[in-house]
Amino acid sequence: MTSPARPLSILHVVRQFLPNRGGLEDVVANLAREQARLGHRVRVVTLDRLFSKPEVRLPARERLEGIDIERIPFSGSHRYPLAPSVFRHLGDADLVHVHAVDFFFDALAWARPFHRRPMVATTHGGFFHTNAHSRLKALWFSGPTRVSVRAYEGIVACSESDARMFAPITPAGVTVIPNGVDLDKFAGAASAAPRRALLTIGRFSHNKRLDRLLSAMRALGPGWRLRIVGVPSDVTVAALAAEIDRLGLTDAVTLHVGLDVPAVRELIGQSSLFVSASEYEGFGLALIEALSAGLVPVAHPNDAFAWLKERHPLISLCDFADPASAAGAIRDAYARLAEGRLDPGAASLPGAEDLSEYRWPRVAARYVALYEAALAGTGAGTGLRPSTSR
């Protein structure tokens, strides 16, 4: 891919970022790095405290992993953090890219007539990750969110299920760009010999349904191991440890918090299957990483995982609400692997799936094309000041 004729000044706005680790943070970090590699000037504005460590205030400005980060204070709930000083950080941005649907999404949209910056947004699943406050969320989605989307030149969904959710409130249409994935990070790291060892990676949050995963582990019985890798969110390490102890799984299940990439890769090397009981995913980044590692995935059939299953037949889906059924699916996936009963076709062997569409150069190119269209649509791409009309 060649560098752009006119480098852009791109501002990413996201509520949580490095040094925090998670799917959203990884997506923004990788996209920012790839755009910088292409010659663009890239900044990230984020909140100055991690939700997992609210007592620690991070530096106002920092450069991490080659990315310029500006952090701002906030108040209110983690679900809708209020951070009005974001407007002081727009600077010379040619385009603002908002990630997720929260205060930033609404505030920058409603203030569009004043800041007049072209904007695109990636939904990352919106705010429907759990059923909590579902009626209020539905009302907000059909009201303020419906109004806010009109301020954006482009709305991007990470999956077809996400696109279906936002299409009814987005008159200009929704563009589907699957998240990019660092396919080299864990490439081929899975155990060469089949093991009754399971791995799950992700935030410790209610929508991940780690409680159901633990119930499936108890149903599996002796001889199985589960490694839970991630960072605390709305489920604490103490709560998880207590549940593991209550179920009598302390010898079978271990928690691994805040690991770096080499440490996670080492755990993958001791595992054969990836498992997820998640009820909701905006995309399913960890599952794609698992496929790249050569792990065999067994996952709950949420919309995002069902969409990925259509593309990647190695994935097994089962209802983790039924521990016995989930345990049976895990045993069957392991047996197919151990006995060599996996389809020998190239698309159905661990590590052999075609994942090229998720490579970051391809994904970044699609986003830059969207940016150029957004700038052209506002007149900014021709050096004119952006119009406030749509």
Locations of regions flagged by a protein language model:
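Glycosyltransferase donor-sugar binding loop
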Residues: 48-51, 201, 225-241
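Aromatic "clamp/platform" in nucleotide-sugar-dependent glycosyltransferases that forms part
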Residues: 279
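Carbohydrate-associated surface elements
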Residues: 161, 180
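Conserved donor-binding/catalytic core segment of Leloir-type glycosyltransferases
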Residues: 11, 190-218, 227
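Nucleotide-activated donor-binding/catalytic signature segment of Leloir-type glycosyltransferases, i.e.
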Residues: 68, 238-259
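Membrane-proximal helix-turn-helix segments that form the acceptor-binding/catalytic region
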Residues: 138-154
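Short alpha-helical donor nucleotide-sugar binding micro-motif in glycosyltransferases
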Residues: 258-259, 266-271
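Conserved acidic donor-binding segment of nucleotide-sugar-dependent glycosyltransferases
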Residues: 311, 315-324, 332-338
